[in-house]
Regions:
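Beta-rich accessory regions
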Residues: 9-15, 252-488
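Beta-rich carbohydrate-recognition and catalytic domains
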Residues: 1-166, 171-216, 227-278, 301-352, ...
Length: 488
């Protein structure tokens, strides 16, 4: 083990001992120290679910990337393990960027992007991003002596050697495949496909998909590719993507394409892109396939352009709650992993509760909960819910029935930076908003709309004492409310 990795492990252990766990997210992965971003290596090994992530332990801002590591059996209660990778080799000295993991020959294999710099003939330095592997036992990992195993020199000449990152690996029959985010010399985002029989010798296959319309960003980060029911799904996170009405608002977006994939020719016929998450804080999702057949997705619960953390907090970055995916009506629908029900406590239920003006319901309060609100077709114009609320703070979700717009507003959640606080969502169901399921943790709100047809993720930095929930309607209406505290 390198001295750099030993140092990171010692530092994170020291910081963990100093951290008040009662102020951290209860059931979401958060930075053990410093900073985390993209989820990496979401995989099954030795009977456990592993998640790694981009990690800089020494400051709450982005720095030379390490890989942090957590493990779970149920995706709700997570155990922090020591850091897995540090940028300690010549080929990754500028960072161990994002990647994935797979079990092979009883080893846990990490595939990641090693970042380094080369000196050009004219004396200028230029970055290079190449794909590397490491072999481990679920806790400690050894980098392959002949890294990198996939380099930009293997790609067509018009593909960038600088922006070539975030490999996602899988196996079909006797062949390993990986896709890698890329762009060409016209600044067109794309993903490339490579293959190997032994994980060590790789070859370029094809450009699997590209921004053929010119509307889907300049660089496709963190790609994922998998079958889901009778379709294949390509997920990526395009940079510099322009908004289209109520879609693709984050600049750094995450989108998915459904399509048909020919495994022999490696041709993917993709459909139009769709937004994965309509909220303010969601990027770089990655999926894994559980032993029971569920395809589950997790993402970084943050935006590159936002800093929604308390000023006194010395760490930054969380992951979303893992979500189950399914294809329905030509779209991906998402649900919180069903394991969350194992942690339901203190139920509180209202059937046909009257809302007229601002209303509070006894027993409906708290900051770590699973809250579902259902409404039938009724005569109102505006309906709103304020969460994590008191006299000073609130995060509101306001539905304007006439336009079918749901507005999220965290302006008063405690944020002290000039960040985006409002997002408007056009409800996809032509019948309008019927059900909202909120998953609240201490620093986040995840909203599942109409049984997961749309999802919106929002980070908040509200003092934990603000635990009120308020309802409002401009006309008398009735709702059904079901609340469970989440208790670990």
């Amino acid at each position: 083990m390198s001295e750099m990795l030993k140092k990171a492990r010692a530092y994170e252990a020291e910081k963990a001992a100093q951290t008040d766990k009662n102020t951290r997210p209860l059931f979401h992965i958060s930075a053990p120290a410093g900073w985390i971003n993209d989820p990496n290596g979401f995989s099954i090994y030795d009977g456990k679910i592993h998640l790694f992530y981009q990690y800089y332990p020494y400051a709450r801002e982005w720095g030379p990337m390490h890989w942090g590591h957590s493990v779970t059996t149920d995706m709700i209660s997570w155990e922090q393990l020591p850091a897995a990778l540090a940028p300690d080799q010549d080929y990754d000295r500028n960072g161990c960027f994002s990647g994935s993991a797979i079990e092979a020959d009883n080893k846990h294999v990490l595939v990641y992007t090693g970042v380094t710099k080369i000196t050009l003939p004219d004396g200028r330095e230029e970055e290079r991003q190449n794909q590397c592997i490491a072999f481990g036992d679920g806790r400690d990992y050894v980098k392959y002596e002949n890294n990198p195993v996939v380099t930009g020199e293997m790609l067509p000449e018009n593909c960038s050697r600088i922006d070539f990152r975030d490999p996602k690996i899988w196996k079909e029959e006797d062949t390993y495949y990986l896709i890698v985010g890329s762009k060409d010399n016209r600044q067109i985002g794309q993903v490339v496909l490579c293959s190997s029989k032994d994980l060590k010798e790789w070859k370029f296959e094809t450009v699997l998909a590209a921004n053929s319309t010119g509307k889907v960003g300049t660089m496709w980060e963190c790609p994922d590719f998998f079958p889901l029911e009778d379709k294949h799904v390509l997920i990526c996170s395009p940079q510099n993507m322009k908004a289209e009405k109520y879609e693709f608002h984050n600049g750094n977006n995450s989108v998915y394409f459904l399509g048909n994939y020919d495994k022999n020719s490696h041709i993917f016929e993709k459909e139009e892109p769709h937004t994965i998450d309509y909220g303010l804080d969601f990027y770089a999702p990655q999926t894994t396939l559980l032993p029971d057949g569920r395809r589950v997705m997790i993402a970084w619960m943050k935006s590159w352009d936002a800093c929604v953390v308390p000023d006194t907090q010395d760490w930054q970055g969380m992951m979303t709650l893992p979500r189950e995916l399914e294809v329905k009506d030509g779209q991906i629908w998402q649900q919180p992993v069903r394991e969350i029900a194992q942690y339901h406590k203190n139920p509180c239920h209202y059937e046909h509760a009257e809302i007229d003006g601002e209303t509070a319901l006894s027993g409906i309060c708290g900051r770590t909960m699973d809250l579902t609100v259902t409404m039938d077709e009724q005569d109102f114009n505006v309906f709103s819910i304020q969460l994590a609320a008191d006299e000073e703070y609130e995060t509101s979700f306001t539905y304007h029935k006439g336009t079918g717009i749901l507005e999220i507003d965290r302006t008063y959640c405690g944020v002290t930076r000039d960040v985006v606080c409002v997002r408007k969502i056009k409800i996809a169901d032509p019948k309008g908003l019927k059900k909202m399921r909120f998953i609240l943790d201490r620093q986040s709100i995840e909203l599942f709309i109409n049984d997961g047809q749309q999802v919106a993720t929002t980070a908040v930095c509200t003092p934990l004492e603000a635990e009120g929930i308020r309802f409002f309607s401009d006309k008398k209406m009735y709702i059904t409310v079901e609340k469970y505290d989440i208790v670990l």
